[in-house]
Amino acid sequence: MASWILKAATQKALSGFPASHTLNRFFQERLTGTLDLTPDRLLDQLRRGARHLQAYRRIRGRLPGTVLEVGTGWFPVIPLGLHLCGCEEIYTLDRTALMRHDDLTRTLSAVAALHREGRLAEALPDVQPDRAARLSRTAEDLERSAKRNATDLATVLRGFGIHYQVGTLDAMPFLEGRVDLSLSNSVLEHLRAAEIESLLGGLRRLSAASGVASHFIDCGDHYAVFDRRVEVYNFLKFSDTVWSLINSRLHYQSRLRISDYRRLFEATGWRIVEEASQRGTLAALAPTSLSPRFQAYRLEDLLVYRSWVTLEPNLPEAGSPP
């Protein structure tokens, strides 16, 4: 049996348990190693954060005052990277509390190690040395302290101007019209279309008139990362009925294509400023017998497996009705 099928079956089974996220964490830590915070993974995440920030600076020519990340995950790498580059007010939101105190201390220690090795600038060209030094001191203090878990992780993060919240955008009315940069990193592909529409609408409501949104979307089959024998288009061969048997709440993949996302952006009041999409080859797609649902898509949209999209509010022109 293909290893991706084993992983999918395991996560499908785990999703039925009350403590599914805890069980899935054990599975990822002990069996798949996907929660190992290696230097390469850390640098990759920091680079992504830098790219979100560069998208804003390219359009607005300055640092954003207020940043909102959707989808914190286990490790607050991107918010910490934004802090290191000079951002002052950073909010990070997750609908499920995945991050633990030990995850935060591991992240701080890993970033501090890169600082000691002089490697932070590889991923963060705009890193501020004084902030990196302060982060390193905090990491050392937490490592030395016998009460390393006594300080609430949210308190530690606030020391870097980072506000960690669990819930939905509805719990953040205080940000309405204030967010300069909103961003997500490999999040949208794990949401249903209706959930994406609700999220994008909420981000549009919170966005400042001059705000910018930056989204990294991984449109490919995520099981291809785990099992190199399958291509990123593998999941396009399944009908919706069959895919629903494979898909799980713990690792939901919508299979939406880039053209679907474009429509969702437009429908929720956003205008695409930049789109940088990576496409595979016809040879890579050829072995996949497309399900009828995907046969109607243009080939150039089907081939997209990753995309960086930068948006700004689609404001009505002066003199036009609201």
Please describe what each predicted stretch is.
Residues 84, 88-163:
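Class I S-adenosyl-L-methionine-dependent methyltransferase module
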Residues 180-194:
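A short SAM/SAH-binding and catalytic strip from SAM-dependent methyltransferases
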Residues 244-258:
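Acceptor-substrate binding/catalytic loop of class I
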Residues 170-182:
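A short acidic, Gly/Pro-enriched loop at the edge of an enzyme's catalytic core
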Residues 164, 263, 272-322:
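A C-terminal cap/extension of S-adenosyl-L-methionine-dependent methyltransferases
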Residues 63-74, 212-239:
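Conserved class I S-adenosyl-L-methionine
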Residues 197-212:
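A short glycine-rich, Lys/Arg-flanked "PGG" loop and its adjoining helix->strand segment in the class I
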